[in-house]
């Protein structure tokens, strides 16, 4: 029986991974490692779940928290394209924090690491080039924001670490998973959009080109892919060692506005008029200036305006081919759970 650690286990995706690990037959203990205290810690009658408050940049505390662990699912990250954190803060957690986790793997002889990367490790790029493809599609990877850059650099670090020698001459095996836009219960950004629509009289004003198609994935299915990858990476001859995979399911691929409308229409939200691009650009520039001068974050800035209006559509079944992944939640269930959470959080 194994001991698993989930860094960022109090977060949006991490919490769902912990929930699913409770049903994993080969897991005896789950260590939930996060810098923040979980206000609603998950409990179980069949698994030992230990919560450890820890900064992943503190090597000594990380080493202590991970001592005795067999496998790490590393989800901890600062996900920010709105200006809440400085560039240095984002790099410190996302890149250097991942360095710390890898160093602990080497020092403690931990043989398996599943890393939560991001679609932004690939794109959309700073040029606004559309992406339609799979893990092996050629694309100009040129990050336009420090968050995307940090996830790209960390992913490369984890991929390079695969098959490296650790304590007692054993090998470290790694795998990277790249969620597309995650949604579901606990999605704070979705909640903000819903609250804005309510404030505008149940109207969703459109800000995104209808042709800017984006792939989405339900949080439960993204979590399941992590749990499944953690199982398969331990098999001799596993295909996933040293590879990266997009997280996907059968959620609709469409623009952000259309996706939100599909999800929220049963909650009484109606489509509104389209805000002119010149006006959005003006507000984005204004918000960028506020961020620079006053450290004031904003959902609308020049970066978010560009990436939301740039197609990023994943068409792949590589996770199914290499580790037998298939979604465990269908779209109807995913949407219903998300709607229920939005209503209950009002």
From Swiss-Prot:
Q: Which InterPro entries match?
A: 3Beta_OHSteriod_DH/Estase, Lipid_A_modif_metabolic_enz, NAD(P)-bd_dom_sf
Tell me the GO molecular function terms.
3-beta-hydroxy-Delta5-steroid dehydrogenase (NAD+) activity; steroid Delta-isomerase activity
Indicate which residues the UniProt annotation says bind NAD(+).
Answer: 151
Active-site residue list: 147
Give me the reactions it catalyses.
a 3beta-hydroxy-Delta(5)-steroid + NAD(+) = a 3-oxo-Delta(5)-steroid + NADH + H(+); a 3-oxo-Delta(5)-steroid = a 3-oxo-Delta(4)-steroid
Q: Which Pfam families match?
A: 3Beta_HSD
UniProt KW Methyltransferase keyword: no
Q: What EC number(s) is this enzyme filed under?
A: 1.1.1.145, 5.3.3.1
Name the UniProt key words of this record, in alphabetical order.
Answer: Early protein, Host-virus interaction, Isomerase, Multifunctional enzyme, NAD, Oxidoreductase, Steroidogenesis, Viral immunoevasion
Its induction note reads:
Expressed in the early phase of the viral replicative cycle.
Annotated membrane-spanning segments are none
- Record pathway: Lipid metabolism; steroid biosynthesis
Q: Name one GO biological process term.
A: steroid biosynthetic process
User: Which family, according to UniProt?
Assistant: Belongs to the 3-beta-HSD family.
Give the protein's function.
Catalyzes the oxidative conversion of Delta(5)-ene-3-beta-hydroxy steroid, and the oxidative conversion of ketosteroids. The 3-beta-HSD enzymatic system plays a crucial role in the biosynthesis of all classes of hormonal steroids. During viral infection, steroid production contributes to virulence by inhibiting the host inflammatory response.
Its protein name is: 3 beta-hydroxysteroid dehydrogenase/Delta 5-->4-isomerase
Q: Identify the species of origin.
A: Vaccinia virus (strain Ankara) (VACV)
- Encoding gene (name): OPG174
């Amino acid at each position: 029986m194994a001991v698993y650690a989930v860094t960022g286990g109090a977060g949006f995706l991490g919490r769902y991974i912990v929930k699913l690990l409770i049903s994993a037959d080969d897991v005896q203990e789950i260590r939930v490692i996060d810098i923040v205290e979980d206000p609603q810690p998950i409990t179980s009658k069949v698994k030992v779940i230990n919560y450890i408050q820890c900064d992943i940049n503190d090597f000594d505390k990380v080493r202590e928290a991970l001592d005795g662990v067999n496998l790490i699912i590393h989800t901890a990250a600062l996900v920010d394209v709105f200006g809440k954190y400085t560039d240095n803060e984002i790099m410190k957690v996302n890149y250097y924090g991942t360095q710390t986790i890898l160093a602990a793997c080497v020092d403690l002889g931990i043989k398996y690491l599943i890393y939560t990367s991001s679609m932004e490790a690939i794109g959309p790029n700073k040029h606004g080039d559309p992406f339609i493809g799979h893990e092996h599609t050629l694309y100009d990877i040129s990050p336009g924001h420090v968050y995307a850059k940090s996830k790209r650099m960390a992913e490369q670090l984890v991929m390079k670490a695969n098959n490296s020698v650790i304590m007692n001459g054993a090998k470290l095996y790694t795998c990277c998973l790249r969620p597309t836009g995650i949604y579901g219960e606990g999605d704070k950004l979705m909640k903000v959009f819903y609250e804005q629509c309510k404030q505008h009289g149940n109207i969703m004003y459109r800000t995104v080109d209808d042709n800017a198609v984006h792939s989405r994935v339900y949080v439960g299915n993204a979590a399941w892919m992590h749990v499944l990858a953690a199982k398969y990476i331990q098999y001799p001859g596993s295909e996933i060692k040293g590879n990266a995979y997009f997280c996907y399911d059968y959620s609709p691929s469409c623009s952000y506005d259309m996706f939100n409308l599909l999800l929220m229409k049963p909650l009484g939200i109606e489509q509104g008029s389209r805000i002119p691009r010149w006006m959005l650009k003006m507000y984005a520039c204004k918000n960028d200036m506020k961020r620079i001068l006053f450290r004031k974050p904003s959902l609308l800035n020049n970066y978010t305006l560009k990436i939301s209006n740039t197609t990023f559509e994943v068409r792949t079944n590589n996770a199914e081919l290499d580790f037998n992944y298939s979604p465990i939640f269908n779209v109807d269930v995913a949407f219903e759970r998300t709607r229920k959470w939005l209503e209950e959080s009002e």
